[in-house]
């Protein structure tokens, strides 16, 4: 997910996206803990996407 795509979304859409990413991160962490996760790079991608969304929410709150 690109930051440019996220900047076009509204605050409500960003909050929804954040919830989806947090759920996905939880599921990936559970898979990793049980040894079922084959693509460990997804954890890093999701973590960075969460940071992108949170950063944009902070920017929009200040503006």
UniProtKB/Swiss-Prot annotation:
What keywords are assigned to this protein? Ribonucleoprotein, Ribosomal protein
A Gene Ontology biological process annotation? translation
Indicate yes or no for the key word Ribonucleoprotein.
Answer: yes
The GO terms this record gives for MF are: structural constituent of ribosome
N-terminal signal peptide: none
| Keyword Amino-acid biosynthesis listed | no
- This protein's GO CC annotations: cytosolic large ribosomal subunit
Q: What is stated as this protein's family in its record?
A: Belongs to the universal ribosomal protein uL29 family.
Could you identify this protein by its name? Large ribosomal subunit protein uL29
């Amino acid at each position: 997910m690109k930051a440019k795509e996220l900047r076009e979304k509204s605050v409500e859409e960003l909050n929804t996206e954040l919830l989806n990413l947090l759920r996905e991160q939880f599921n990936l962490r559970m898979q990793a803990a049980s040894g079922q996760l084959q693509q460990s790079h997804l954890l890093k991608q999701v973590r960075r996407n969460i940071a992108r969304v949170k950063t944009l929410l902070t920017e929009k709150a200040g503006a």
